[in-house]
Amino acid sequence: MLKWLYRLMIELTNHSLSSKMIAIFTKSRLSALLIPSYAKIYDINQEEMEKNLKNYETLQQLFIRKLKAGTRPIDQTKNSVISPVDAIIEDIGVIRENSEIVVKGKTYSIAEMLGSDEAAKKYLNGLFIILYLSPSHYHRIHSPISGVVQKQWALGKKSYPVNRLGLKYGKRPLSKNYRMITEVAANGKHIAIVKIGAMFVNSIELTHASEHLTKGQEIAYFSFGSTVVLLFEKDSIELDERIVAPMGVKVGERIGYLK
C-alpha cells in the first residue's frame, strides 16, 4: 500500500511541465529571495563557499556553487581511490554473477543501469558503492582516480527521487532515471562513474574536456541533489577499513585502494 501511494504521488507531480517550471524558477532572480531560507533549512556551510551567500543571484547558482581553494584536500596516497562527491554512502555490496545488485532491499540490474549486458560484463562479481547527495551537499563531481576516459554515454529521460524513500519504494531509479556514465581505465582495470539525475531538476553538466583525468579533478556537476554509483571490476579495489554504510564522506577522502 505504501509503495503504491508513494508511486502515485510521484507520478502525479513528476512531469515535464513541472520540471520546466521549477528549472525556470531556480534560474530566475526571483528565486534569490529563497536563498537565505534554503541555506538555513539545509544547514549549508557558508564558510566553505567560494562567494558570500548574498552574492549568489539565483538558487541555481547556489546549487552549483564552488568551494574555496583547499577546502577539499585530495588524498595523494599511491593508488588511492577518493570519494568523487560530498555525500552519504548509502550502500556497498557485491555485483552478482547475473549483474544484479541489492540496494535497500530492492534488486537492480547493472546491465540495465549501463544499457547493455556487454557494458556490464566486466563488472560482474565486482563492487558497487552508492553515494547519495542531499540538497545540502556540494553538487560538483570529481574524478575518484587518475585515469583515461574510455567511453561516456547517457541513458534514460525521466527521473524519480533517489533518496531513501525513492530507493525503497520507487521504480528502480538507479537503473531507470536519466543518467550519464563515464568509464575510466587505470592500472588495467575499469571504473564506471554513474551520475544519476534527480526528480524535477533533471540535469547533469560535464565540465571536463580532456580524456585524461587526474584524481580530484572536477568532471561534472548536478543541478540539484542526486546520486553517484561507482562500479568496480572484480578484485580491483580494496576498501579503506573505515568505510561502511551509511556514513558521510567528502570529496578527496580516501575510500579505498586500487589493487
From Swiss-Prot:
Q: Tell me which cofactor or cofactors this protein depends on.
A: pyruvate
Modified how? Is synthesized initially as an inactive proenzyme. Formation of the active enzyme involves a self-maturation process in which the active site pyruvoyl group is generated from an internal serine residue via an autocatalytic post-translational modification. Two non-identical subunits are generated from the proenzyme in this reaction, and the pyruvate is formed at the N-terminus of the alpha chain, which is derived from the carboxyl end of the proenzyme.
Pathway(s) where this gene product acts = Phospholipid metabolism; phosphatidylethanolamine biosynthesis; phosphatidylethanolamine from CDP-diacylglycerol: step 2/2
Point out the annotated site residues (description: Cleavage (non-hydrolytic)).
Answer: 225-226
Identify the EC number(s): 4.1.1.65
Which residues does the entry assign to the active site, renumbered to this chain? 86 (charge relay system), 142 (charge relay system), 226 (charge relay system), 226 (schiff-base intermediate with substrate)
Q: Which residues carry this modification: Pyruvic acid (Ser)?
A: 226
The first-level EC class reads lyase
Membrane protein topology class: Peripheral membrane protein
**What biological function has been recorded for the protein in this entry?**
Catalyzes the formation of phosphatidylethanolamine (PtdEtn) from phosphatidylserine (PtdSer).
Instruction: Please give the family membership noted in the entry.
Output: Belongs to the phosphatidylserine decarboxylase family. PSD-B subfamily. Prokaryotic type I sub-subfamily.
Q: How does it assemble?
A: Heterodimer of a large membrane-associated beta subunit and a small pyruvoyl-containing alpha subunit.
Q: What is this protein called?
A: Phosphatidylserine decarboxylase proenzyme
Q: Which organism is it from?
A: Geobacillus sp. (strain WCH70)
Identify the coding gene: psd
